Regions:
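Conserved sequence signature across two-component system core domains
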Residues: 17-18, 42, 60
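Two-component/phosphorelay signaling modules centered on CheY-like receiver
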Residues: 21-40
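Acidic catalytic/metal-coordinating carboxylates
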Residues: 44-47, 70-73
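Alpha4 helix (beta4-alpha4-beta5 surface) of REC/receiver domains from two-component response regulators
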Residues: 73, 94-111, 117-121
Length: 136
């Protein structure tokens, strides 16, 4: 859902789901440096689902390894709940097998969680309704 702030300014809502407060904080700072993007945060996959139900974001940045509900399990559930929501999976390693599993869960992009430029490029691609799969 795009938030209309005035006649000329649109905000894109990005939800970050990661169990690491340091990573969420860093991603938030990186995302909010981009004009017109605002962030929400979730602690794990289950929390992401709850936040998506409360306030529909325009895109989800989802960590793979989280307690309570991991990224792939969350992606499956989120695709049933909000099938049009673009999901960008962030993980330290991107072997071809993981990329294939992510695609099978309805994820539209995979990036290294430690490459800020790659994350921004992935978000931009998904917002243009393109896929963005990086591999190691």
């Amino acid at each position: 859902m795009t938030v209309y702030v005035s006649e000329t300014v649109l905000l894109t809502r990005v939800l970050i789901a990661d169990d690491s407060i340091m990573l969420r904080s860093g991603l938030r700072k990186l995302i909010e440096e981009h004009s017109g993007w605002v962030c929400g945060e979730a602690l794990n996959g289950r929390d992401a689902i709850r936040r998506i139900q409360q306030r529909a974001p325009d895109i989800l940045i989802l960590d793979l390894c989280m307690p309570v509900m991991d990224g792939l399990e969350a992606a499956r559930a989120i695709n049933k709940l909000a099938p049009d929501l673009p999901i960008l999976l962030c993980t330290p390693d991107l072997p071809p097998s993981l990329v294939s599993m992510a695609q099978g869960c309805g994820i539209q992009g995979t990036v290294s969680k430690y490459d800020g430029r790659q994350i921004i490029s992935g978000v931009e691609a998904l917002l243009r309704h393109e896929t963005f799969f990086c591999r190691n």
